[in-house]
């Protein structure tokens, strides 16, 4: 009997880029994957960040102060969030960013940092497609994942798209990798193309990113 591997595709939206300088999470979206396939089980919540959301951040995700003011604060949703992810691997695009914010929120509550294994799909894509643009939109275009509903960043939408991209990055349903379709990253010339031997990374305490 095949062993079931449970993973969680995860994304967050925030008030900015700097958790160390007081930026907070405003949305968490998670999708359950069993053997890389979404089950339909999800965790999704909007969060009152207990601070003003800057206009620059609102332009990214559309979550303004009026919308968020009556939403629960992180400490009110933490138990449900931790219960949903358990100790299973987290699949995140640019994992350092999200992990730093999640651990910052947990630290405010006196809870230790997450020690779940983390699969960083950004690292995977950079190794698969060196020198190419590998943001989520670029990968959706490359793998022909429909992202027409992604007019703004949204944690649940992005977690759902990421689950499809992850399936392709790990071999997909009989998917043949084509390295020629992605755009070159700015100022970079693609080196010789090769696949990495290991695509998994573990993050305990994230460092500043973006």
Model regions: which residues?
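Conserved non-catalytic scaffold segment of RNase H-like nuclease domains
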Residues: 1-116, 126-129, 138-152
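Acidic, Ser/Thr-rich low-complexity intrinsically disordered segments
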Residues: 187-210
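Acidic, Mg2+-coordinating catalytic module of metal-dependent nucleases/exonucleases
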Residues: 89-92, 96, 101, 105-106, ...
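General structural signal for secondary-structure boundaries
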Residues: 64, 73, 135, 203-210
């Amino acid at each position: 009997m095949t062993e079931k591997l449970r993973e969680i595709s995860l994304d967050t939206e925030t008030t900015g880029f700097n958790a160390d300088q007081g930026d907070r999470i405003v949305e968490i979206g998670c999708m359950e994957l069993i053997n890389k396939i979404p089950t339909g089980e999800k965790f999704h919540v909007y969060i009152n960040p207990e601070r003003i959301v800057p206009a620059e951040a609102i332009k990214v995700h559309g979550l303004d102060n009026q919308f968020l003011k009556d939403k629960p604060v992180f400490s009110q949703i933490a138990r449900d969030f931790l219960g949903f992810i358990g100790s299973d691997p987290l699949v995140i695009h640019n994992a350092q960013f999200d992990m730093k914010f999640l651990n910052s929120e947990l630290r405010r509550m006196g809870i230790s940092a997450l020690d779940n294994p983390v699969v960083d799909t950004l690292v995977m894509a950079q190794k698969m497609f060196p020198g190419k643009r590998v943001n989520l939109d670029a990968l959706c275009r490359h793998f022909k994942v429909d992202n027409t509903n992604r007019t703004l960043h949204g944690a649940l939408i992005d977690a759902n798209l990421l689950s499809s991209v992850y399936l392709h990055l790990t071999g997909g349903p009989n998917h043949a990798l084509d390295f020629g379709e992605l755009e070159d990253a700015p100022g970079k010339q693609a080196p010789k193309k090769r696949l990495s031997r290991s695509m998994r990374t573990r993050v305990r305490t994230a460092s500043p990113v973006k």
